[in-house]
Amino acid sequence: MKKPKVYAHASYVGTTGYNNHTRDFFRSLSKHIDLKVRNFTIGKNWNWPNNEPHNGEDYINDTDKKLLVEQTLWTGKDTRSEFPIYSDYPNEFKHNVNLVLEETNHHYFYDDYVGPKIAYNVWESTLQPEQFFNKLLEYDQLWFPSQWQADCTIAQGADPNKVKVVPEGVDTKTFFPEDPVTKLDYVDGRFKFIVFGRWDYRKSTKEIIETFLKEFKPNEPVDLIVSIDNPFSGDGLESTENRLKHFGLEDPRIKIKHFPSREDYITYIKNGHVFLSCARSEGWNLPLIEAMA
């Protein structure tokens, strides 16, 4: 059986859980098959027009530059266009499979594709929105990270023969037990609880912080390290500091980290004493899995 030649459509650039999973997954997959990527997102260091517009992101490496062949950009209120990128890293081949790895209801799922197409989606509820679910049914295969999501999808009406479980992986060369030296404001003899994940009702962020403040007295040598910014929350509070103030949760033991670099994130995970997670629902929860590793 010949190996597939895959054209992936995904949000490759960025620092969200979806972005990190996408990069790790496609970097690994590219070691085994021909793979190229159409990317939807841009990072904070976006540089356009430019043949290499994502070089300002500190996580972009030569593998990424080879994989990234096309960039989607909005050209009008409801119109998108595709632009070639990283042409100095040749990766031309005729693909025979399309793979869409995106969040629920993303534009890429609704695009027209020639040939077999696979939908890879992470969702934290028992039901998909009806319009989106009907679109999923048009795909040749449906990939999900857990047996639970696969079972929910079949229960909603998908053909069991099309549903596959493809777990999200962890880079074991990056996430492994050790006691790394760090220059971060972190190793000071105090016990560190850590929370990584956007401020969200689903993730019980407010309740975790409330519980920490109720459990530990101010004179105890315990800190709560939080990286919980959510610029898309819709609550009008705009920042983690404003949310803590709004809910009466300000405390010097809460150490706020605004979107730390990948390197710093790894260091925080490895140096933390306890990783806290108490989500009402999760599609996968990559930071928790990485902390466990």
Where are these regions (language model features)?
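Short alpha-helical donor nucleotide-sugar binding micro-motif in glycosyltransferases
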Residues: 267-272
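Aromatic "clamp/platform" in nucleotide-sugar-dependent glycosyltransferases that forms part
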Residues: 280
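Conserved donor-binding/catalytic core segment of Leloir-type glycosyltransferases
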Residues: 7, 185-203, 209-212, 224-226
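Helix-loop-beta element that forms the nucleotide-linked donor phosphate-binding surface
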Residues: 150-170, 177
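Acidic anion/phosphate-binding donor-loop and adjacent secondary structure
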Residues: 130-131, 170-185
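Nucleotide-activated donor-binding/catalytic signature segment of Leloir-type glycosyltransferases, i.e.
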Residues: 237-263
